[in-house]
């Protein structure tokens, strides 16, 4: 047990980074607003034209020197200068700069790890679609799966205490407490209406949430490696990280609480896979339900004792993989048994051999897609196409190009679907919504406008996939048609955007 405890000491840096003084450096805010560094996170205009203007930063810093807005009192808690009249602007600017600063210890540790292993940073990137071929190869041989929602902290102070292992600057931690205290409810309530602050400060809250996920996964992966004689060499993709894609090919060391030392020997699973995605994770194994129940008990104890998060064991279901479907990255995935009957004749005897083969299927769920189209005003709640009044002022070519771009992105991302019937319906909604928008702009009926456009307009939507396929396959009709009906995983997709982001 002492040997285990030696492995469990985290290799955290003991250096004391003085991060708080960087908050008063203008270049930090320029980095925060650099779209080249934040391509995946869009920035909403906060009411000023030049987002990187040093004048605004100087005024903010001067105001912070002249006043002490971070101190709350009963008298001015409502009309505080910091969270008062200019609450959105000032808090957004500060939190964006603070998000860049607090990531410094993590980024240094990440780059040092790559240099120590002589791994080029570019080789560590993985497409979102790269996980699906992995699932197709591995999940057909597994038997049980558990799909779990990762619980949130009940209090922000627990999250701050976790960060103390990495960030040694007390002033920075106090400022983080300030942001979390003010906006904690919007962070831990996903269904709640997203406030202006939350939309404009996604990077800070992603950092706070990912630090919790990182701490949990360090412990989880340590126990996984301890439970098996086989090293964890599979590629693990963490979609919610600030540095998104990580390879797990080394022995993970983690801090471990004394409450779990007695159950380390329980887990001897030689064939288990773990995938985390969008606030959830699932573990799949080839072993018996008894072992899966032991992992279930471990997870509940881990969250309750180490992270002080109450989690009911009944929320972790153990299902047979061949009878269970789970939603994963815009797909509904499952393992199905495909039966094939082979007729064999030997001399005068005739045999019928029934072969059952497992196949990993990925289907596009139509209801979530129609919900996204409805939120973006492409259709009503029943999926009937409607016009887009916000695009009437644009030119005809601009309107058509926007609809084609959305259609192309959807076709590109969902090209790996086993059945494309749902995708055809979505394309039909977009095509008819585009026609209705153009007809409304020119004050004509849909039928009249379709006759005016002719067949060339419809061909733009119908031939979009074949144009993409021609880049990766010979331009023959049979090959293009066969690939279009089959599954294609494009390995150049590194982010997922809602339909509204394509507007």
UniProtKB/Swiss-Prot annotation:
| Keyword annotations | Chloroplast, mRNA processing, Plastid, RNA-binding, tRNA processing
Described by its record, this protein's role is as follows: Usually encoded in the trnK tRNA gene intron. Probably assists in splicing its own and other chloroplast group II introns.
PANTHER family according to UniProt: MATURASE K
- Please give an example of a GO cellular component term from this record: chloroplast
Q: Which HAMAP family match?
A: MatK
Give this protein's Gene Ontology molecular function annotations: RNA binding
Family assignment from sequence similarity: Belongs to the intron maturase 2 family. MatK subfamily.
Q: What processes in GO biological process is this protein linked to?
A: mRNA processing; RNA splicing; tRNA processing
Recorded source organism is Agonis flexuosa (Australian willow myrtle)
Highest taxon listed in the record's lineage: Eukaryota
Among InterPro entries, the record links this protein to: Domain_X (IPR024937), Maturase_MatK (IPR002866), Maturase_MatK_N (IPR024942)
What name appears for this protein in its UniProt entry?
Maturase K
Q: Does the keyword Thylakoid apply?
A: no
Question: Where is it located?
Answer: Plastid, Chloroplast
């Amino acid at each position: 047990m002492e040997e285990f405890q030696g492995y469990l000491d985290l290799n955290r840096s003991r250096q004391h980074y003085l991060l708080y003084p960087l908050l008063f450096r203008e270049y930090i805010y320029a980095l925060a607003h650099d779209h080249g560094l934040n391509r995946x996170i869009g920035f909403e205009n906060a009411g000023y034209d030049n987002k990187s203007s040093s004048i605004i930063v100087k005024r903010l810093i001067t105001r912070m020197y002249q006043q002490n807005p971070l101190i709350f009192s009963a008298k001015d808690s409502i009309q505080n200068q910091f969270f008062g009249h200019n609450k959105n602007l000032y808090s957004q600017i500060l939190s964006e700069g603070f998000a860049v600063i607090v990531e410094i210890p993590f980024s240094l540790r990440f780059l040092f790890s790559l240099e120590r292993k002589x791994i080029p940073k570019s080789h560590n990137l993985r497409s979102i679609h790269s996980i699906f071929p992995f699932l197709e190869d591995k999940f057909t041989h597994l038997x049980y799966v558990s799909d779990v929602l990762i619980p949130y902290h009940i209090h922000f102070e627990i999250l701050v205490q976790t960060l103390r292992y990495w960030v040694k600057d007390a002033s920075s931690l106090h400022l983080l407490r300030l942001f979390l205290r003010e906006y904690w409810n919007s962070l831990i309530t996903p269904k709640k209406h997203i406030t202006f602050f939350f939309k404009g400060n996604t990077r800070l809250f992603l950092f706070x949430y990912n630090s919790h996920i990182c701490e949990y996964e360090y412990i989880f992966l340590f126990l996984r490696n301890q439970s098996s004689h086989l090293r964890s060499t599979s590629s693990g993709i963490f979609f919610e990280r600030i540095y998104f894609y990580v390879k797990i090919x080394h022995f993970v060391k983690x801090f471990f609480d004394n409450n779990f030392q007695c159950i380390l020997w329980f887990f001897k699973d030689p064939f288990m896979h773990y995938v985390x995605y969008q606030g959830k994770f699932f573990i799949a194994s080839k072993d018996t339900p008894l072992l899966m129940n032991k992992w279930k008990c471990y997870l509940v104890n881990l969250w309750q004792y180490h992270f002080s998060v109450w989690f009911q064991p009944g929320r972790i279901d153990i299902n047979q993989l061949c009878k269970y479907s789970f939603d994963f990255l815009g797909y509904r995935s499952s393992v199905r048994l495909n039966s094939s009957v082979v007729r064999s004749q030997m001399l005068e005897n005739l045999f019928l051999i029934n072969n059952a083969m497992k196949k990993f299927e990925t289907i596009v769920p139509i209801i979530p897609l129609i919900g996204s189209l409805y939120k973006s005003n492409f259709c009503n709640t029943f999926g009937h196409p409607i016009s887009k009044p916000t695009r009437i002022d644009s030119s005809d070519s601009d309107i058509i190009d926007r609809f084609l771009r959305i259609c192309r992105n959807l076709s590109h991302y969902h090209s790996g679907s086993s059945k494309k019937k749902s995708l055809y319906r979505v394309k039909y909604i977009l095509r008819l919504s585009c026609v209705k928008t153009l007809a409304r702009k020119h004050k004509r009926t849909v039928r009249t406008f379709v006759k005016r456009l002719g067949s060339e307009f419809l061909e733009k939507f119908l031939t979009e996939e074949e144009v993409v396929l021609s880049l990766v396959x010979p331009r023959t009709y049979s090959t293009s048609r066969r690939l279009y009906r089959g599954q294609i995983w494009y390995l150049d997709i590194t982010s997922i955007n809602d339909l509204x982001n394509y507007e």
